[in-house]
Each structure stands twice: as structure tokens, then as C-alpha cells.
């Protein structure tokens, strides 16, 4: 029988539900070397964490994250709070010598991200960052194909993450406040596609240019559930329209859209685009990678498929092939879920990552590489470089962004 490890969840909300589901489901679909026990969830006084605990299967609830992180009963700390609250519990977990998993971006500022990565490296503590899209079978398979040299030398990468939920009717919330979120679409969406393309291609961004950052909606109405600090849940933000609020307006201090160009360490070039008001794109999270022997293309709105172009075939029969990444013998993770061709969904990426985390903690190799605090710090450096480029209107060398 597998050894047990007690999990503490710091935070609730959208990601709290996603992570709770993953920790609760992982031992049902996989045979992890450690059995995760959903020990305690933390929430602020007004969040009523006891209700969350009862609904999502946590044995205990707490309103004191510091005591929870330091408790000798806790084996791993998982952080899902708003971005500005990531660093304190993460540093406390590292100081206590405990493995720490954290949502992305790992911090609201580059300085905090660097401090967290350095602390983890110094303490030699295992850390993990929930760049969950790495665990989509199609993305993990693409990573394997590139490592095998299937598409040859990479020349171009185009990545975009487009959503359309943040129109003028959406009220003010923490996601629109820089001191709480760090950034808008940039940290929320570009962070994912920077990590995904870094993971799939194996390339590092060396320079950034041509960046544009824009905020289209400068003010948003504060809804009644908000006490004035912008701390409302994602559900309140997305489903309570602005006419449910008061006459008071909140100043939006983050971006609605950020676009930028890059050059990679092998000489390849690329582009990135993140937007929350790209009408018609509900969760169009995708990329295309072009190599000398072929290309790969992915869009999360069709997450079970990967597009592959084989340029080594005779010219007369060349064309894009749609691969259903649902075959347990060939595609990562899917054998542990449903029979072949029975598709999986968003939540399974988290469950698969929980499994790989447990493998790593038991000294075993994960299915594909897990992102740690240093990986997230490298992503944060690119985010910072793009914003510097947008502000200063010049090329930015990543070597100068630390």
C-alpha cells in the first residue's frame, strides 16, 4: 500500500476547485507511489473555508495559513490564492523544508519570483508550478515529437491565448488591480503560452521587441459583494454584471491585451499575443511551431487533437494531419482515463499533474518534465521584458532582465 502525504491547500476559488478535484481524483485514475490525503484548506475569514472543505472533500479548514504551512502534519503545500499572496506561504513552506506547488504566475513581481526561485534552490526543496496545459496529452506528445527531431530545426513559433469574457459589463475585481494581480492578460494568459512553447520547443527566448500593451476598459463598476479592495471571486466577477453594483468605479491598472515579438537562442523567431476581449475566442489557447521537416499546431478549444504537417512526404500528398491524441498506447496520460477515443477535458490536466508531482516526490521520473519555481521565474523574466519593451519602445535582451 502506498505511503500517505498530507496536502494543505492555500486558497479557494476557481483554482481551488480545480486542485481539489485533482487531489481527490488522482488515486482513482492512477496508482501514485504516494497517496495524497486532503488534509486542510485555508481561506480568509469572510470566505467560510469550512463550507468549501465540506463540499470538496477536505478534512479540515483553517483561517491561519502560517500555522497550517508550519504544521508538522503537512507534507506538501499547494497555493492557489490571488497572485500577490503567493510569495509569503511559498517562502514559509520552503523555509520549513516542505515541497511547494504554486499557481502561475508564481508572483506578482519579477523580484518576488526571483526570491522564491532562489529560496527553493538554496533549500533544495522540490517545487512545482501549475502550468497545467503541459499535461494535455496533445501538448505532452508534441514535446516528445520535437525531442525526437520529427519536425527538424525550429524556425518559427506563433502563440496566442485569446479570451472574450472581459467586456465592459464585467465588474471590478482583483484581476483588474495591478497590486493584486501583477498584470492582466499578460500574466494570466501569456504566461501559459510562454511556458508551453518553451516546454514543447526546448528553446529559450533571448530578445523581445515590438511589444504593445493596451487597456481598453479604464474603469469598471464595483459590485455589491466587494468591500472596496477588489477581492471578489471569479464567479462574482464573471456572472454578476456591472448593473448589480453601486455607482462607485474601480480604476483598472492592468492590461487587456499584450502582443510582442521574440528571437530564440537557436535563431528562430516568434510572436505572442494575449487578449481578454478577442470576441469569439472563448479559450483559444494555442500555438504553431514550424520546423525544417514539419510543423505542429495546437488549440486548447480542440484539446484532444494535435495538427501535424510532414514536409518529408512527397509534395503531392503533403498536408495537415489531425492526430486524435486519445490512444493509450501512444499518447501520454490517456490510458489512465477512458477507453481509446473517449476524450478527456480541462480537469484531467490537473489530475495528471498531481500524479507527476507524486511521482517526483517519491523519487521517480514524471511522465514529461514538471515546471518548477525556476521555470516559472524564466517565464516571469519574459513577461517583464515584454512590458519593458512596451514601455520603453526598444529591444530588450533577456540577459539584462533578472
Residue ranges, per PLM feature:
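N-terminal Rossmann-like dinucleotide-binding module
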Residues: 1-56
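C-terminal glycine/acidic-rich active-site capping loop/insertion
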Residues: 13, 217-259, 263-266, 287-288, ...
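Predominantly a Rossmann-like dinucleotide-binding segment in NAD(P)-dependent oxidoreductases
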Residues: 15, 133-251, 306, 393
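Short active-site oxyanion
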Residues: 36-40, 59, 75-77, 184
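Beta-strand-loop-alpha-helix segment that lines the small-molecule cofactor/substrate pocket
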Residues: 75-76, 82-134, 149
Amino acid at each position: 500500500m502506498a505511503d500517505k502525504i498530507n496536502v494543505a491547500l492555500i486558497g479557494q476559488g476557481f483554482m481551488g476547485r480545480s486542485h481539489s478535484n485533482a487531489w481527490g481524483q488522482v488515486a482513482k485514475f492512477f496508482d501514485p507511489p504516494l497517496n495524497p490525503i486532503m488534509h486542510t484548506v485555508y481561506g480568509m475569514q469572510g470566505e467560510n473555508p469550512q463550507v468549501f472543505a465540506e463540499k470538496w472533500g477536505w478534512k479540515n479548514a483553517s483561517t491561519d495559513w502560517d500555522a497550517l504551512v508550519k504544521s508538522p502534519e503537512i507534507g506538501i503545500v499547494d497555493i492557489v490564492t490571488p497572485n500577490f499572496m503567493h510569495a509569503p506561504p511559498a517562502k514559509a513552506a520552503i523555509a520549513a523544508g516542505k515541497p511547494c506547488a504554486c499557481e502561475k504566475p508564481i508572483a506578482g513581481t519579477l523580484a518576488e519570483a526571483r526570491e522564491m526561485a532562489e529560496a527553493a534552490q538554496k533549500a533544495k526543496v522540490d517545487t512545482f508550478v501549475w502550468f497545467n496545459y503541459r499535461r494535455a496529452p496533445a501538448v505532452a506528445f508534441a514535446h516528445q515529437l520535437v525531442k525526437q527531431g520529427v519536425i527538424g530545426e525550429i524556425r518559427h513559433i506563433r502563440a496566442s491565448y485569446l479570451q472574450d469574457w472581459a467586456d465592459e459589463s464585467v465588474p471590478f475585481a482583483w484581476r483588474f488591480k495591478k497590486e493584486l494581480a501583477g498584470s492582466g492578460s499578460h500574466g494570466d494568459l501569456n504566461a501559459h503560452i510562454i511556458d508551453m512553447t518553451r516546454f514543447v520547443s526546448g528553446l529559450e527566448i533571448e530578445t523581445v521587441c515590438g511589444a504593445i500593451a493596451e487597456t481598453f476598459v479604464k474603469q469598471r463598476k464595483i459590485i455589491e459583494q466587494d468591500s472596496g479592495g477588489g477581492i471578489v471571486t471569479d464567479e462574482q466577477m464573471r456572472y454578476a454584471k456591472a448593473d448589480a453594483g453601486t455607482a462607485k468605479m474601480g480604476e483598472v491598472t492592468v492590461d487587456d491585451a499584450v502582443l510582442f515579438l521574440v528571437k530564440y537562442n537557436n535563431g528562430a523567431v516568434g510572436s505572442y499575443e494575449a487578449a481578454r476581449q478577442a470576441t469569439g475566442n472563448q479559450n483559444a489557447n494555442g500555438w504553431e511551431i514550424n520546423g525544417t521537416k514539419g510543423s505542429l499546431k495546437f488549440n486548447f478549444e480542440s484539446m484532444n487533437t494535435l495538427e501535424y504537417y510532414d514536409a518529408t512526404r512527397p509534395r503531392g500528398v503533403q498536408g495537415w494531419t489531425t492526430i486524435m491524441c486519445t490512444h493509450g498506447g501512444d499518447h501520454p496520460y490517456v490510458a489512465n482515463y477512458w477507453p481509446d477515443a473517449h476524450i478527456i477535458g480541462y480537469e484531467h490536466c490537473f489530475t495528471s499533474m498531481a500524479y507527476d508531482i507524486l511521482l517526483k516526490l517519491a523519487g521517480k521520473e514524471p511522465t514529461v518534465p514538471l515546471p518548477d519555481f525556476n521555470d516559472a521565474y524564466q517565464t516571469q523574466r519574459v513577461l517583464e521584458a515584454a512590458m519593458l519593451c512596451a514601455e520603453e519602445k526598444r529591444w530588450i535582451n533577456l540577459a539584462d532582465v533578472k
